[in-house]
Structures are given as C-alpha cells and as structure tokens.
Amino acid sequence: MVAATVAAAWLLLWAAACAQQEQDFYDFKAVNIRGKLVSLEKYRGSVSLVVNVASECGFTDQHYRALQQLQRDLGPHHFNVLAFPCNQFGQQEPDSNKEIESFARRTYSVSFPMFSKIAVTGTGAHPAFKYLAQTSGKEPTWNFWKYLVAPDGKVVGAWDPTVSVEEVRPQITALVRKLILLKREDL
C-alpha cells in the first residue's frame, strides 16, 4: 500500500514537471495597452518579435522606426512585433498606458500590438518575460531587448539593444519564409 502511494505521488510529480516543461510563450496572457486581458495564444502559428520598449530612451527612435518598418514589411506574412512598455531601466517609460500608446502611434505610426506597462526583470517580472529570460538564458538589462519567438512559442533568439533590428532582420525573415513555405505545403 505504501509503495503504491509513493509510486502514485512520484508519478504526479513527474507529470507536473513534464507539464511545466511543455510551457511556451504563447501559453501566457497579458493586458493590452487599452486594459483588455489578451491570451498570447492568438499569436501562435506566427513569428513574434517580443520587445520591452520605452519612450524616453536613447534607443527609442532607432528601434521604434525599425520595428514599425518590420511590422509593415512582414506583418502580412504571419509576423508580429509585440511591444511591452517597461519603466525599470532609467525610468524611461514614466507615462500612463494611454500616453505611451498616443506617443507611439502619433510619433511612429505604430501598427503592431502594444501591451500595458510591465516589469520584465526581478520578482515582479511578468511571467511571459520570466519565460523568455529563462529559456533564452538572457534577461533584459536595458530597454529594447528583443526575443524572437517561433510559431510554436519557443524562443529562438535574444538580443540586447545594441544589436539593431536591421541586424536581426535576416533571422526573422528566414523564420517567416520557413513558415510561409510550410503553410504552402499544407494547401
């Protein structure tokens, strides 16, 4: 009886560990910039570039322009930039979500999804960013960290803000092309 109980407990622990290992980026939820809870599952099957953004950073202009161009060029082909404002680095995103959205849309005409301001590091970090940091081995240390997420939700690349969007673009484009070819084969 004791052996059966121990075996059952071990089996439950093993199953729980396996279930945790199966988690991916698209399993999380986040609040969008307008306050609505969104399942990131809606982006499954697409390539995503997840970025922690800030409005008052030295990297803001270069990154926002390049991210919007990337969204414009690749968005029609199962790709999304997913922007998460963050005020943890240099207090460079101090405004409200409404002001952040207004700034991004007015200044850069952003058309990519934006989410509510979050923490991306530390104990209060959003679970999706904890996942990105743990699976890539690279935790954000400043604004405009970029994580490339495959259609299956797995992280396939991570870059700090000194790496430009243009430098990352070939890897993103290759992943999008691969996805397009797979979708064509399914027809």
Swiss-Prot record:
Enzyme Commission identifier(s): 1.11.1.9
Source organism (scientific name): Homo sapiens (Human)
Family: Belongs to the glutathione peroxidase family.
Catalytic activity entry: 2 glutathione + H2O2 = glutathione disulfide + 2 H2O
GO cellular component: endoplasmic reticulum; endoplasmic reticulum lumen; extracellular region
Keyword Hydrolase listed: no
Classification via NCBIfam families: gpx7 (TIGR02540)
InterPro entries hit by this protein: Glut_perox_Gpx7 (IPR013376), Glutathione_peroxidase (IPR000889), GPX_AS (IPR029759), GPX_CS (IPR029760), Thioredoxin-like_sf (IPR036249)
Protein origin, superkingdom: Eukaryota
Matches recorded under CDD domains: GSH_Peroxidase
Protein name: Glutathione peroxidase 7
One BP term from GO: cellular response to oxidative stress
Molecular function in Gene Ontology: catalase activity; glutathione peroxidase activity; peroxidase activity
Signal peptide bounds: 1-19
Tissue and organ distribution: Expressed in esophageal epithelial cells; expression is up-regulated after exposure to acidic bile acids.
